[in-house]
């Protein structure tokens, strides 16, 4: 339940715990903290037009791009569907 089978990212199950910990750390350390919620636009159209296998491949590629471009101390979650 903690790792998304399709994208191999953390699932939203861990988001509250990790986010709370990072907010506490940033507050105590006096360092900035950034969070993004990203939704893939028109994703239903992709699934409807090219099929779910293509949609799954796009989700894997998007997840990989996010994961590979986040600092080593950062986290990437698949919140659900096409939201990261």
Task: Give the role of each language-model region.
Residues 1-10, 24:
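Amphipathic HAMP/coiled-coil signal-transducing linker helices
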Residues 11-34, 44-67, 77-81:
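Conserved long alpha-helical elements within nucleotide-processing catalytic cores of c-di-GMP signaling
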């Amino acid at each position: 339940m903690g790792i998304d089978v399709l994208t191999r990212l953390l699932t939203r199950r861990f988001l509250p715990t990790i986010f709370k910990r990072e907010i506490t750390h940033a507050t105590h350390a006096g360092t900035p903290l950034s969070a993004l919620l990203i939704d893939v636009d028109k994703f239903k159209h992709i699934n409807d037009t090219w099929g779910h296998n293509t949609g799954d491949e796009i989700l894997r590629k998007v997840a990989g791009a996010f994961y590979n471009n986040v600092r080593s101390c950062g986290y990437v979650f698949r919140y659900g569907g096409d939201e990261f």
